[in-house]
Design a protein with these regions (language model features):
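An alpha-helical support segment within catalytic cores of ATP-dependent transferases
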Residues: 2-20, 95, 106-117, 125-195, ...
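Active-site acidic catalytic loop and adjacent metal/ATP-binding pocket
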Residues: 30-37, 43, 176-227
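ATP-binding pocket architecture of kinase catalytic cores
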Residues: 21-145, 169, 187
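Short, flexible helix/strand-to-coil boundary loops that buttress conserved ligand/catalytic motifs
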Residues: 46, 69, 103, 215, ...
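Helix-rich C-terminal or lid/interface subdomains of diverse kinases
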Residues: 219-301
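Short, surface-exposed alpha-helical segments at coil->helix boundaries
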Residues: 4-5, 62, 241
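Nucleotide-sugar-dependent glycosyltransferase catalytic core
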Residues: 48-51, 144-155, 226-233, 257
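Active-site phosphate/pyrophosphate- and oxyanion-stabilizing loops and adjacent acidic/basic residues
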Residues: 9, 66, 245
């Protein structure tokens, strides 16, 4: 039932007028099973996990996208097919590829600047959207994890796994980092965030010189606006600073980039969970992490 054929059968039963020949199951997406129809349509089926109500989050995502579709400066998915129970849906595929750091670095300076400025416009719009846009049927609104929650997960779930392949000094830096993260106070304001604005979800146009779209709003939540700037530090300090300056030109949130750096350091540590799948990238990450953590801890004692 969960394979490509089974999911395609569900699509045909729900939408008999939608003609397609090929259904391919994508292995991308931890929170959804994704089926690509004729390389033209993307259908997403939320996974149900213990402690999470992914179908409810999916319906909240659909409501948010419907609100953004006509006003966003960057294309977002437009769901043209939604099952009667709101349990799955499909949109016309946005042609593009993930904006990997190497592709971003290969662009002209003007193209990079234009992309960052458009993303700043997008974030201003998204962050000004009332959080009620993602409220579930009972009124609940998903919230970003606190630093203390990330610290507790590190201790309970992640530390022992990562300790197997990092040396003692680096592990000690990680422990100090998570304690610092847990001690971080609340942000000056909370907004509706994308929640997972990484290279996987920012698509470059086929010409690799502009943005084709932003996808996967399934982790949208109420949280720190700095969280949506996190991944841009993977494009370099200059890119993150440009985005922060365009997003907050009056400097009303002077700690914005510092909080993004903390979040980025946590993101880099979390990447070590994929060590076995990406040995070359992991070797480089292990070489970079001591300096990155020292820098973050020095800036955030």
């Amino acid at each position: 039932v969960d394979g490509a054929d089974g999911l395609a059968a569900r699509i045909r039963a729900e939408f008999p007028a939608l003609a397609f020949d090929k259904a391919a199951l994508s292995d991308e997406g931890d929170d959804h099973r994704i089926v690509i129809l004729d390389d033209a349509w993307v259908f997403r089926f939320p996974r149900q996990r213990e402690g999470e109500d992914r179908p409810a989050l999916f319906r909240a995502e659909l409501a948010l996208l419907a609100r953004l579709a006509d006003v966003s400066p960057i294309p977002v998915p437009r769901y043209e097919f939604i099952s009667a129970d709101g349990g799955f849906g499909g949109y016309r595929k946005i042609a593009g590829e993930p904006m990997r750091p190497a592709l971003f670095a290969a662009m002209s300076p003007d193209a990079r600047t234009a992309i960052l400025d458009r993303i700043a416009q997008f974030l201003k719009l998204l962050h000004a959207t009332p959080p009620s846009a993602i409220a579930r049927a009972g009124g609940e609104i998903a919230r970003e994890w606190t630093g203390a929650a990330f610290r507790d997960r590190w201790i309970a779930e992640r530390r022992a796994m990562i300790a197997r392949f990092v040396d003692a000094p680096l592990l000690e830096r990680m422990d100090r980092f998570y304690e610092r993260l847990a001690a971080q106070g609340p942000p000056p304001r909370e907004v509706l965030t994308h929640g997972d604005l990484s290279d996987d979800h920012m698509l470059l146009s086929p010409g690799r010189d502009s943005l084709a779209g932003i996808i996967d709003f399934g982790d949208a939540c109420l949280g720190d606006p700095a969280y949506d700037l996190t991944f841009f530090l993977s494009y370099g300090e200059a890119a993150a600073r440009r985005l922060a300056d365009r997003y907050d030109p009056m400097g009303e949130d002077p700690g914005l980039l510092a909080r993004a750096r903390l979040s980025h350091a946590r993101f880099r540590i979390e990447q070590l969970r994929q060590a076995r799948a990406f040995p070359h990238e992991t070797a480089q990450l292990l070489a970079d992490l001591p300096g990155l953590l020292d820098q973050v801890l020095e800036r955030n004692p």
